Swiss-Prot record:
Keyword Transcription regulation (UniProt): yes
Gene Ontology molecular-function annotations: DNA binding
Record's keyword terms, sorted: DNA-binding, Plasmid, Transcription, Transcription regulation
Cross-referenced InterPro entries: Homeodomain-like_sf (IPR009057), HTH_TetR (IPR001647), Tet_transcr_reg_TetR-rel_C_sf (IPR036271), TetR_C (IPR011075)
UniProt organism field: Bacillus anthracis
Domain HTH tetR-type, chain residue ranges per copy: 5-65
Name of the protein this chain belongs to: Uncharacterized HTH-type transcriptional regulator pXO2-48/BXB0055/GBAA_pXO2_0055
SUPFAM superfamilies: Homeodomain-like, Tetracyclin repressor-like, C-terminal domain
Pfam families linked: TetR_C_13 (PF16925), TetR_N (PF00440)
Residue ranges of the annotated DNA-binding region, renumbered to this chain: 28-47
Top-level taxon of origin: Bacteria
Keyword Protein biosynthesis: no
Length: 196
């Protein structure tokens, strides 16, 4: 990695933390300069504007989360175990989420809707990608004869992704992981009802 790349990566990683903990609108270029200890010129040589930094930081958050999801699924044998492993990535959503500040998808969706179309589009794609991951695992479960064949795959996948985001939000806003625990408990019952 070149020196320029390292500086750009530092800007992205630092900005991701700031945006996800303080919010996009509450984070200024000056905040990024202070946190990175870089002058304005170093930032603007790499990014046209704050919006470009936001989009790069959001992309980075996706890479980080997908890495967590794949690592969680590594030694799981069944589709249900893989799905539950993904959900357990956020088991301490209130105090110790995988990325400080909570779920970048949820935070970005809330901050972007109606005001930042490019980020809203990226967040919508992030949600769709999560639904498709769930759908691929459900399909895998059907193909391996772990799950019943009459499942509406996309409907269940969307329900699972939406429920996960809701559980993360409830745990974060209440500062209590009990909501994520309830989610896991209920989702287990729901998923096992589809077992063969």
């Amino acid at each position: 990695m070149t020196k320029v790349d390292k500086v750009k990566e530092k800007i992205i990683e630092t900005s991701l933390y700031l945006f996800n903990t303080n919010g996009i609108t509450r984070t200024s270029i000056q905040d990024i300069m202070t946190a990175t200890e870089l002058p304005k010129g170093s930032i603007y040589r790499r990014f046209k504007n704050k919006e470009e930094i936001v989009l790069a930081a959001y992309d980075k958050s996706g890479e980080i989360m997908w890495s967590h999801f794949h690592k969680a699924m590594e030694n799981k044998k069944t589709a249900i175990d893989k799905i539950l492993a993904i959900f357990l990535v956020y088991q301490d959503a209130a105090n110790n989420p995988p990325i400080a500040g909570g779920c970048p998808l949820l935070n970005s969706a809330i901050e972007s809707t109606g005001v930042f179309p490019e980020l809203q589009k990226a967040a919508a794609k992030g949600y769709d990608d999560t639904v498709m991951l769930m759908a691929s695992l459900i399909k895998e479960g059907i193909e391996k004869q772990e799950l019943k064949e009459d499942i509406d795959i996309i409907s269940l996948a969307s329900f699972l992704a939406s429920s996960m985001e809701g559980a993360i939000m409830a745990s974060r806003v209440s500062n209590d992981n009990i909501h994520h625990q309830y989610f896991i408990e209920q989702i287990k019952h729901h998923l096992y009802s589809y077992s063969k």
